[in-house]
Amino acid sequence: MDSSKVPVKLAKVIKVLGRTGSRGGVTQVRVEFMDDTSRSIIRNVKGPVREDDILVLLESEREARRLR
């Protein structure tokens, strides 16, 4: 697959909501799209992440379920 033709969206982490996953290896965050700052969604992120990080989202429509 040619990665130069995959549309990506840039999103900025505005709030870290908490840890999830069986061992806490996934972090749930609220992100705001760089091109449309009025739109924000919740995503699960694997690996280290903190506020003001920029994420490259290959799939921008999928939203994570909130933690209980």
Swiss-Prot record:
PROSITE patterns: RIBOSOMAL_S28E. Keywords: Cytoplasm, Ribonucleoprotein, Ribosomal protein. It comes from the Eukaryota. Transmembrane segments: none annotated. GO terms for biological process: cytoplasmic translation; maturation of SSU-rRNA; ribosomal small subunit assembly. Signal peptide: none annotated. SUPFAM superfamilies: Nucleic acid-binding proteins. Component of the ribosome, a large ribonucleoprotein complex responsible for the synthesis of proteins in the cell. The small ribosomal subunit (SSU) binds messenger RNAs (mRNAs) and translates the encoded message by selecting cognate aminoacyl-transfer RNA (tRNA) molecules. The large subunit (LSU) contains the ribosomal catalytic site termed the peptidyl transferase center (PTC), which catalyzes the formation of peptide bonds, thereby polymerizing the amino acids delivered by tRNAs into a polypeptide chain. Component of the small ribosomal subunit (SSU). Mature yeast ribosomes consist of a small (40S) and a large (60S) subunit. The 40S small subunit contains 1 molecule of ribosomal RNA (18S rRNA) and at least 33 different proteins. The large 60S subunit contains 3 rRNA molecules (25S, 5.8S and 5S rRNA) and at least 46 different proteins. PANTHER family: 40S RIBOSOMAL PROTEIN S28, SMALL RIBOSOMAL SUBUNIT PROTEIN ES28. There are 2 genes for eS28 in S.pombe. Belongs to the eukaryotic ribosomal protein eS28 family. This is Small ribosomal subunit protein eS28B. The lineage of its organism: Eukaryota, Fungi, Dikarya, Ascomycota, Taphrinomycotina. The gene is rps2802.
